[in-house]
């Protein structure tokens, strides 16, 4: 088994910011993010065909901005602005588009996509499977396994880098100076300005 877990929330915001506004002519509904999201999802599935192609796939979404972390620490991500008004009606449409691809769309109240991705990744690894996490989220790098049973794929284009960049234990070490299992300790010591964690 080779499980592909896509950080759907990340894909939504990338698609939203990458494309100009687009609305449906019949009713003016914003759909630019949905168009970009589906194009990205289609490209991903096409790019990963071959001998090492995933046998299973799911797209994981944040349920909402509120999670068990905000209950424990109210300042968690408190500095982030709310989602743009024209993006909000596109959230359910991206889930529907995912299901239209016949791909499971998974989210759970009070949990972030990262939590669900980590749970599924560890369960698949423990069952002897291989896991690819499609995300550029540094928080997920702690899941990368030196034996390659869990690795990441960053599909965000960056100058001077390939369009699809694999992240294994070596890349995690290059970024943090520690092995993946120590990333959580580095973040605990350094905090995380992105998530407003001191």
Each PLM stretch: what is its role?
Residues 1-75:
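Non-catalytic, usually N-terminal nucleic-acid engagement modules in DNA/RNA processing proteins
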Residues 21-24, 78-198:
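Extended two-metal-dependent nuclease catalytic cores across DNA- and RNA-processing enzymes
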């Amino acid at each position: 088994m080779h499980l592909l877990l896509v950080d759907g929330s990340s894909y939504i915001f990338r698609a939203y910011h990458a494309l100009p506004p687009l609305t449906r002519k019949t009713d003016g509904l914003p759909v630019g993010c949905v168009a970009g999201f589906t194009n990205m999802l289609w490209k991903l599935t096409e790019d990963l065909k071959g001998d090492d192609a995933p046998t299973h796939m799911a797209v994981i979404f944040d349920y909402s901005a509120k999670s068990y972390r905000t209950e424990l620490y109210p300042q968690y991500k408190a500095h982030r602005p709310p989602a743009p008004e024209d993006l909000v009606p596109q959230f359910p449409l991206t889930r529907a588009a995912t299901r239209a691809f016949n791909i499971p769309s998974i989210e759970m109240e009070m949990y972030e996509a990262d939590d669900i991705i980590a749970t599924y990744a560890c369960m698949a690894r423990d069952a002897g499977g291989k896991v690819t996490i499609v995300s550029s989220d540094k928080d997920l790098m702690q899941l990368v396994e030196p034996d390659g049973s869990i690795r990441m794929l960053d599909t965000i284009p960056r100058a001077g880098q390939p369009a699809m960049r694999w992240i294994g234990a070596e890349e995690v070490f290059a970024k943090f100076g520690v092995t993946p299992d120590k990333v959580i300790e580095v973040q605990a010591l350094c905090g995380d300005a992105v998530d407003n964690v001191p």
